[in-house]
Structures are given as C-alpha cells and as structure tokens.
Swiss-Prot record:
GO MF terms held by the record: antioxidant activity; disulfide oxidoreductase activity
Gene3D superfamilies: Glutaredoxin
CDD domains: TlpA_like_family
Source organism, top-level taxon: Bacteria
Name this polypeptide is given: Protein FixW
Pfam families, A to Z: AhpC-TSA
C-alpha cells in the first residue's frame, strides 16, 4: 500500500464538524507554520501527549506557529456522544487551554490525513510549512529538534526534508511508548481492565523518572 500523503505533499484541508476550543479555522494561511496533532480519548498516552503539546505551544508562543489538536477517530453511538466525550477529555487533560481543538466524526480528516499517510495509530503529529506543504509526519517528541529548523527555514535541503537522527535516549523513549501502547491495546481487546494499570506500574518500577508513565498512572486511576 502506497502513501498518498508524504513529506512535501500539499496539506489536506481542515474539515472538522466542531471547534471545541479556540477560534474556528477554515484553512491554512500561507506564511504560517502549523502543528497538527491527532489524538483520541481511547489512546493510552494521548492525554500526556496533549500536555506535551501545550508545553511546546508555550515554548513557541512568540513565533508564527499555530498549534491544533484534532480528534477524528472516536467511536461512540452518535457524533454527539463522541463530541461530549472528547470535550470532557480535553477539560481533564488541558483545562483552560487556548490551543485550537477540533472534532470530526465524518471520517474525512481520518481518511485525508491519517490513512493517506499510512498513520494507523494516534497520537500522530504533522507540521504544515509556510508554503502549505507537509514538512513533518511523526512523533511529537521529535519536534524539539524539528520545529526550530522549520521556523528558521533550514529544515529543507535541495527541496527535500531530512528526518533528524534519533538519539539512543529518544529511540528508547519511543520504543517504550509503542510497547506500552501495544500492551494496553491488547488488554483492552480482551477486556482485561486491570492490565493497563499493571503495565504502567511495572514501567514505573523500571523507569521511576518517566513523566510519561506517571501521567498515565494518574490518567488511569
């Protein structure tokens, strides 16, 4: 299966049914950089990821970077139920946030962004460059290195984006998150509700300094 949304591709449009936080956005403005973070209330580490998004927003508050959160893959009986659940989740994880938060239950955003880029899990981060093209697709944790280069205009070389080399620490952190996600997803699949909490507690015993795991412990309690 080939990806139809790649680095350098024109960014798909923003098509949400509701803006739950922030001012509505109908399209990307040329000359601005956008960070678009896809999340879900059913994702084990999306809540701490949104907290990290808020920290990045604060760090780059003086730049022309816009931060957007999108919930586009929620499962519920009705769109109203899904929207209410997402709204409650945002209130819990990001109270009083001024980051734009959009909700789409039509499937268009999921199809045009996630499936088109072969991104089959959330959270997933996209960066839209000043010319309206996709500059980055990947993990939010990598934006500490990527975003300053996009802002400075040094991210592209000869018209091609270069993915930053991942340090050993970064690789370990990403692997930890993916292993955690796989274990929690498998537990939920068989309705073993105690297993996610057990996985978090085991992870904290192995890595007591992990803010990511401690946030998940809070979220699951």
């Amino acid at each position: 299966m080939a990806s139809s949304l790649n680095l350098g591709s024109p960014a798909p449009p923003i098509k949400v049914q509701n803006w739950l936080r922030g001012d509505p956005l109908s399209n990307f403005q040329l000359g601005k950089i956008y960070v678009v973070e896809f999340f879900s209330i059913y994702c084990g580490y999306c809540a701490p990821e949104l907290s990290d998004l808020a920290k990045l927003h604060k760090k780059f508050i003086d730049t022309r970077v816009e931060f957007i959160g999108i919930a586009a893959s929620e499962e519920a009986a009705t769109a109203d139920d899904a929207r209410a659940q997402v709204d409650a989740s945002i209130t819990k994880s990001l109270p009083n946030t001024n980051i734009r938060m959009g909700f789409d239950h039509s499937g268009e955003m999921d199809e045009d962004w996630l499936k088109a880029s072969l991104s089959f899990h959330v959270p997933k981060t996209f960066v839209v460059d000043r010319d309206g093209s996709i500059a980055f697709i990947g993990d939010l944790v990598m934006l500490q290195d990527v975003l300053p280069k996009v802002i400075d205009g040094n991210w592209r070389a000869s018209g091609k984006q270069r993915m930053p080399k991942r340090s050993g620490l970064l690789k370990a952190r990403l692997m930890l998150r993916r292993l955690f996600h796989d274990r929690v997803s498998a537990a939920i699949e068989i309705k073993n509700w105690k297993a996610p909490l057990s996985a978090i507690e085991e992870g904290i015993n192995l890595n007591p300094d992990s803010i990511f795991l401690r946030r998940n412990l809070y979220w699951h309690e």
